[in-house]
Amino acid sequence: MDETGRLIRDAAGFLLQRDLGGSYRLVLLRVPVDLVEKRVRVRGYHAGDNVVEADGVAPA
């Protein structure tokens, strides 16, 4: 999975609001607090319904 969108933080963790519409709940090993509310690129794999195990999060 390789997607771009806006990184959002909520009470349950992090979400990616996709540029193409919809959102994914992200499972992250590192907490990218410097990228919250910014446009990012997420790489990883689908772990279930709308859940992504993120290998990396970087500015888009």
Spans of model-derived segments:
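Structural detector for short beta-strands of small beta-barrel domains
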Residues: M1-D10
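Flexible glycine-rich surface loops and low-complexity tracts that mediate binding to linear polymers
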Residues: G5, E37-E53
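Short aromatic-glycine-enriched beta-strand elements
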Residues: D10-L16
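A mature extracytoplasmic/lumenal domain signature
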Residues: R18-L20, H46, A58
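Beta-strand/loop nucleic-acid-binding surfaces
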Residues: G21-V33
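Short, compositionally biased
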Residues: A54-A60
